Amino acid sequence: MNKGKKKVEAQVFFQQEIAPGIFDMWLTTDLAKTANAGQFIGVYPADKSKLLPRPISICEVDKDNNRLRIVYRVAGGGTEEFSSYKAGKRVQILGILGNGFPIREGEGK
C-alpha cells in the first residue's frame, strides 16, 4: 500500500544496456523497504530544463539491500540522460507511487 510519496536521493548501484535502447538499472534507496513490484517511481533528470520526473515501473525489489530495479526504454531526453548514469551516480527520485502486486512462487512446469 502506498503510504505517501517522498522526494529522496538514491544512488545508482548498477546499470547495463540489455538490448538496443533498453536499460536495466538498480537504485539503492531506503524507499525499497516499502516498495513492491508493480509500483513506480519518478526519476528526476539532472538537467534542470526538464522539470518533471519520468515515471518508471519497479520490476524487482531487494529489501535486504535497499535496492529497486527498474528497466526502461530510451524514449526522449530524460531517459537518454539516465542511460549515461554509472554506478555511484546520485539521483533524485519521487516515490513510492501506485499500487503493487504480490509475487507468488511458481508451481513449476
Predicted segments, located by residue:
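Ferredoxin-reductase
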Residues: 2-86
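FNR/FR-type flavoprotein reductase catalytic core
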Residues: 80-109
